Amino acid sequence: MGVFSTLGNHDYGDYVQWPIDGISKNQNLENLKQVHADMGWRLLMNEHVILEKNNEQIALLGIENWSAKANFPRHGKMKEAHAGTEKYSFKILMSHDPSHWAAEVVTQYKDIDLMLSGHTHGMQFGVELPGFKWSPVQYMYKQWAGLYEGDNQKLYVNRGFGFIGYPGRVGVLPEITVIELV
């Protein structure tokens, strides 16, 4: 079926002064898109693909970064990605920022069954014990790690394995998630 990806807030280079080493902001983004292609990844940019197995079909939607937080620009166009998916009974959305779920997905796109997100990194700091998880990121993001459910929709927020700022983690382990659809 392949590997699919979307862009997150840092991928656009909005936080630095351009040009850098003679490369423009737009060229940097194009270079990043090419890296995805060179790795064999299909970068979904406000679009969808249909995955098929055993005569079953799933619509996989991927949008550019969309955030409900004021600091992050909205590049994502959910309407474009969603167009043409109405006939598919199961839809998965890849959207980098989990704030997108409550702000738009659950209110305007009730037919999205599962949203896959990241962005928070669990703030790379927290406490996880059986039945208890805490991180200061929860004061900024209600959905910051793990599975969340609302009505007939689900959101999974992956804490990732990278970092932002401090190059380490305390109490919040890196994560690679495997989700099996049956």
Model-assigned labels for residue ranges:
Residues 1-182:
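Soluble catalytic domains of enzymes that build or remodel membrane lipids, polysaccharides, and related
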